[in-house]
Amino acid sequence: MPEQQRLASLDSSTASRLPAYSQTLFEAKTEKGLTFEAIAQHLGRSEVAVAGLFYGQVQASAEDVDKLSELLSVPKEAIAKQMMGFPDRGRAGPMPPVEPLIYRLYEIVQNYGYAFKAVMNEKFGDGIMSAICFNTTVDKEVDETGASWVVITLKGKWLPFARF
């Protein structure tokens, strides 16, 4: 029997920290029964970028707003101004995170951050991985035992530190 599709929705404890349009988008997404993957296909963007739009962490283009308005049956005027403004990133949750899945990602950086840094430095030199010239994907793999595995790919441009 196929697994029933479940949709990500906006938790009331998070809503107050997000832009006003977030609730509008999440309600319309739920009403239409759409996944971030389906919305991403319509917008021609990655599903993580689209989820970022919903949480106010990614700036929308005029084309994004038009397509979201059409797909979700949300009046363009209700979302355009805020979505096309400059995002106020990094305010969606407390630090350190308390949501268990988000905390596990934080824990990965705590535990392996210096290891990632050391390996990147050896491969690329002194610098940083951009989170601006960046993309990411989330995929699902199922192993031979039937266990599900999460595959998160982080791809950022390497930015060497300038000598001055």
Swiss-Prot record:
NCBIfam families: cynS
Its biological purpose: Catalyzes the reaction of cyanate with bicarbonate to produce ammonia and carbon dioxide.
Catalytic-site annotation from UniProt: 104, 107, 130
Xref: PANTHER family: CYANATE HYDRATASE
Pfam family, one: Cyanate_lyase
UniProt-recorded Gene Ontology molecular function terms: cyanate hydratase activity; DNA binding
HAMAP family noted in UniProt: Cyanate_hydrat (MF_00535)
EC number: 4.2.1.104
Name under which the protein is recorded: Cyanate hydratase
